[in-house]
Structure formats: C-alpha cells, structure tokens
Amino acid sequence: MLRSPYSGGHLEVVVGPMFSGKSEELIRRLTRSLIARQRVAVFKPAIDNRYHASEVASHAGRTLEAVAVPDAQAIRAQLSGQGELLSAAPEGVDVIGIDEAQFFGPELVPLVLELADAGVRVVLAGLDLDFRAEPFGSMPELLARAESVDKLTAICTVCGAPATRTQRLIGGQPARFDDPVVLVGAQESYEALPRAPHRAQGGVTTPSPLAS
C-alpha cells in the first residue's frame, strides 16, 4: 500500500496473533511511505525491549527506527511539544506508525482519532486478543473506528492450520487463565494456535455460551 485509497487523514489497523507478521506489515507500509518521500514518525512502547530498544523489529529480523515511549501521552508530547490537543497535523509528519498498540492505554484512542482528523495517515499494529483469547485493551475500539482493518493469521507449528490465537507458555505448558495479561516475550513464551486447541490452565479461553 503506497498511496492509501482514503483521502486525507485516516486510521489503518493491522491485527493478529503472535508470529502473524504484524510488525513486518507495519514496517513494509512505512518503508513504502519513506520511499515515496513522505514524512514518517514511528513509535513503540518502551516495555517492548525484546529485540531493539529504539527500533520496531519483526520476528523475521526486519527493523525500522522508532521512538520508544512509555504511554500515549508521551507520543502526544513528542508530536505537539507540549502535550496539547492536535487540531492540525504535526509539523513535518505525513504518516505515523505505532507498533504493539495493545500495550498503550485508552488514551491512545483519542490521540489517533485527533491525528486522523488533522489529516495524518495513522497505521497501527497490535494483538487483537490476549493469551486468554479475550479482546486486548483498547484494540476493540480502535478496530471499530478504523477505516481499514487487516486481520492476519500465523501458522500453527503443531498442525499447520491457520492460527488466530496466541497461547502463552510457562515451562512449555499453557499459562493459567488468571495469569497477568501483559508479559513481553517471543517464541520462548508464546505460540500461535487455531481456535480448537486454544486453552489456558484453570479455564477455557474461548468459552461458548452454548456449552451450558
């Protein structure tokens, strides 16, 4: 996607489980914008230090320079200089990319909407579901408000089927359902699975209301 089919500012969201290529797709889109000589700003949560502290990195090894910030308010401050409301596009910015969007709090929603309303193309990548297969943070509202949504799948390394869920592992076994939601990790802590075998100890992560 070089030039978006949407005129003016808008919001694009790329979601999926771990290992589905979300960061890879974010890097691809932003790199194409850079090739087109568009002005791009990239942000990532400071909590994500798995590969590079100051780069967005895919599991395949592709990277793109980024600013690590603790929260959405820090992104606002970086763009406005004073953390004020963004009634106009930030000077020198055409496209803004944010990786691991699920780690930012609810303050991310009004920020990206302000940016889009101000004429900026905003591209987010993140997990739509946590390891319990429940909606992750503010991602549901971001998905609902986006002009463009792409849901990617990974590949289950057990059966080879398209994987839509993220299973957290502790000592090679599924994590407990009541374990903390946020745990930054990669292949040592997570695997991608299809719906059917996705479970967490202490509870089924995708309970069906028809089961009772």
From Swiss-Prot:
It comes from the Bacteria. InterPro entries: P-loop_NTPase, Thymidine_kinase. Transmembrane segments: none annotated. The active site is at E100 (proton acceptor). ATP binds at G16, P17, M18, F19, S20, G21, K22, S23, D99, E100, A101, Q102. One of its GO terms (cellular component) is cytosol. Gene3D superfamilies: 3.30.60.20, P-loop containing nucleotide triphosphate hydrolases. Its EC number is 2.7.1.21. Its main location: cytoplasm. Pfam families: TK. Signal peptide: none annotated. It catalyses: thymidine + ATP = dTMP + ADP + H(+). One of its GO terms (biological process) is DNA biosynthetic process. Keywords: ATP-binding, Cytoplasm, DNA synthesis, Kinase, Nucleotide-binding, Transferase. One of its GO terms (molecular function) is ATP binding. It is an enzyme of class 2 (transferase). Homotetramer. Belongs to the thymidine kinase family. This is Thymidine kinase. It comes from Deinococcus radiodurans (strain ATCC 13939 / DSM 20539 / JCM 16871 / CCUG 27074 / LMG 4051 / NBRC 15346 / NCIMB 9279 / VKM B-1422 / R1).
